[in-house]
């Protein structure tokens, strides 16, 4: 279900991009921006996978052991969120510094100029993506797949609405990803902080 929602989002984005102009410049600029963005996204995805592995590992450890149990899982999860944010900041700075490398991605001057601002917008979003992907990795570790899919469907709905309002330029489409990812982050943090297995109230109840 989560994959279906993601595919709907990508289809909506590509539809907005392809109908933007008849020359194909916008589509080419979006493709170049996405390629540069995905170079950093690989590292963030790796951290998400790590979160999905470490959390069940800690939860399945002995509650009485020094390294196991819910409280240790909470520490690991919080640490991963911090690392996700810091990694996102680093990757965002790195992507911003890669602007002079645009000619290596496309020789067309018009595409290079149109891709500059989307690349910078993507760089600004990297810290947000670091948090989002770690949160979703944590939810996968808790096997909260239905909630993850539900949050993704809601976020996709917001994204489609944002595209109708601001999706008439390449920069506008990339700004719409803020709406998409902030919604995903809301559902991820809600699960982590308020109503998931590692929520603060849950840990307080266990410690009493």
Model-derived regions, located:
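Small-residue-rich hydrophobic transmembrane alpha-helices
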Residues: 18, 27-98, 132-143, 147
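Alpha-helical transmembrane segments of multipass membrane proteins
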Residues: 11, 15-16, 39, 100, ...
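Acidic, glycine-rich loop-and-beta core segments that form the ion-binding/anion-interacting portion
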Residues: 1-3, 13, 18-19, 23-30
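Short alpha-helical transmembrane segments in multi-pass integral membrane proteins
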Residues: 55-125, 162-208
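Membrane-helix interface/capping residues of multi-pass secondary transporters
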Residues: 24-27, 145, 170-173
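Hydrophobic faces of transmembrane alpha-helices in multi-pass small-molecule transporters and flippases
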Residues: 1-12, 39-43, 47, 119, ...
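Hydrophobic/aromatic end-of-helix segments at the C-terminal termini of transmembrane alpha-helices
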Residues: 5-17, 51, 98-102
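Short runs within selected transmembrane alpha-helices of multi-pass transporters and secretion channels
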Residues: 45-48, 121-141, 147-159, 172-192
């Amino acid at each position: 279900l989560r994959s279906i929602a993601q595919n709907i989002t990508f289809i909506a984005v590509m539809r907005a991009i392809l109908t933007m102009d008849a020359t194909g410049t916008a589509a080419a600029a979006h493709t170049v921006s996405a390629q540069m963005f995905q170079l950093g996204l690989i590292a963030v995805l790796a951290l998400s996978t790590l979160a999905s592995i470490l959390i069940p590992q800690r939860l399945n450890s002995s509650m009485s052991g020094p390294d196991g149990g819910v409280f240790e899982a909470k520490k690991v999860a919080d640490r991963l969120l911090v690392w996700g944010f810091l990694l996102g900041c680093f990757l965002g700075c790195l992507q911003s510094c890669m602007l002079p490398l645009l000619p290596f991605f496309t020789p067309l001057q018009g595409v290079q100029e149109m891709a500059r601002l989307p690349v910078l917008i993507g760089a600004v979003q990297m810290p947000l993506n670091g948090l989002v992907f770690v949160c979703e990795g944590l939810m996968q570790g808790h096997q909260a797949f239905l909630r993850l899919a539900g949050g993704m469907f809601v976020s996709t709905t917001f994204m489609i609405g944002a595209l109708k309002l601001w999706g008439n330029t390449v920069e506008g489409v990339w700004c719409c990803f803020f709406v998409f990812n902030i919604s995903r982050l809301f559902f991820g943090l809600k699960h982590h902080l308020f109503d998931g297995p590692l929520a603060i109230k849950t840990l307080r109840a266990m410690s009493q």
